[in-house]
Amino acid sequence: MNKLINDYLTKMGAMYTFELDSEFNETVKTRGMENFVYNSFSEGQKYRIDISILFAWRDLVRLISGSRVNVLVLDEVMDGSSDTDGIDALVEILDHIDDSIYVISHSEKIEAMEFDRTIDVQMNGKFSEIKISV
């Protein structure tokens, strides 16, 4: 698990490593090998750790179960406190996944990103309007 997490952290440009022990206590080490706790990091750094853990769990479940789920739904992962570099790194990871990916977002910054198709849902009074762009 730790190897998977750190592989994703590397892809996200993190300059630190993350480890979980058998009781799921975390240790975060910088290049100088100083130990830190998760809450001592910036929101952007925590975002990278969170995304790395998410993808590591996904990979681990695939390895253990032997089944291949081909849908990935990410709800508001680009709406939080990540910086532009963190979001760019996430998009790069998503570009290498062959599954159907659904990114749900309320952020306007996602509109500038290139996706194969977008479904825009807007409230119009008491009803929702749906626009599909290809």
Language model region names:
Residues 1-134:
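Terminal ABC-like ATPase head and other globular end-domains that cap long coiled-coil arms
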